[in-house]
C-alpha cells in the first residue's frame, strides 16, 4: 500500500501556484507530479492545475509506466496551449513540472524547469535532476559553483517550462 503526504508553501506570493497529484497505478505502481506555476507571468496556478489534471486523467487506468511520462507531458503541453487560447492568455500560464512514475521494476523521471527530484540513500542526496535555469547552466559551464545556484541573482530565470519548449 502506498502511503504519502504532500505539502506546498506559497511563500510571499498572494496565490499558491503549486499543484500536486499522486495517483496509484496497478498493484504496486504509482505516479506523481509536482507543478510550480511561473510567478510574474500570471495564471501560474491555472497552468500548474491544468498540467496536474491532464497527468491525473491520463494515468487513470494505465498500468504501463514505461513511456508514460513523455506522452503525458506532451499531452499536458497541448492541453495547456488550448487553455491559453480559450482564456486569451497566450503569453501567460507557464509552469515547471517534475514527475515520477514507478512500477514493480523501475522508476521513471521527467522534468522541465527548476522543480527538482532528489534521490536519497541513507539520508544523503545521491543525485538530483538538473534545473533548466540560468544559474544551473552557469554551474555546468563552471562559471559558478553548484553551491552558488541557490543565491544567484538569476535563480528564478527558467530557460524551459511547459509552453516554453
Each language-model region and where it sits:
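PP2C/PPM-type serine/threonine phosphatase catalytic domain
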Residues: 1-163
Amino acid at each position: 500500500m502506498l502511503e504519502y503526504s504532500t505539502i506546498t508553501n506559497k511563500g510571499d506570493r498572494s496565490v499558491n501556484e503549486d499543484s500536486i497529484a499522486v495517483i496509484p497505478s496497478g498493484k504496486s505502481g504509482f505516479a506523481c507530479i509536482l507543478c510550480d506555476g511561473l510567478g510574474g507571468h500570471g495564471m501560474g496556478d491555472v497552468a500548474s492545475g491544468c498540467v496536474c489534471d491532464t497527468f491525473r486523467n491520463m494515468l487513470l487506468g494505465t498500468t504501463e509506466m514505461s513511456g508514460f511520462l513523455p506522452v503525458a507531458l506532451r499531452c499536458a503541453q497541448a492541453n495547456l496551449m488550448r487553455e491559453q487560447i480559450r482564456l486569451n492568455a497566450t503569453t501567460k500560464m507557464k509552469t515547471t513540472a517534475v514527475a515520477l512514475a514507478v512500477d514493480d521494476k523501475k522508476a521513471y523521471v521527467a522534468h522541465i524547469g527548476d522543480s527538482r527530484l532528489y534521490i536519497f540513500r541513507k539520508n544523503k542526496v545521491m543525485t538530483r535532476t538538473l534545473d533548466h535555469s540560468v544559474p544551473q547552466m552557469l554551474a555546468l559551464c563552471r562559471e559558478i559553483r553548484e553551491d552558488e545556484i541557490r543565491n544567484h541573482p538569476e535563480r528564478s530565470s527558467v530557460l524551459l517550462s511547459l509552453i516554453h519548449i
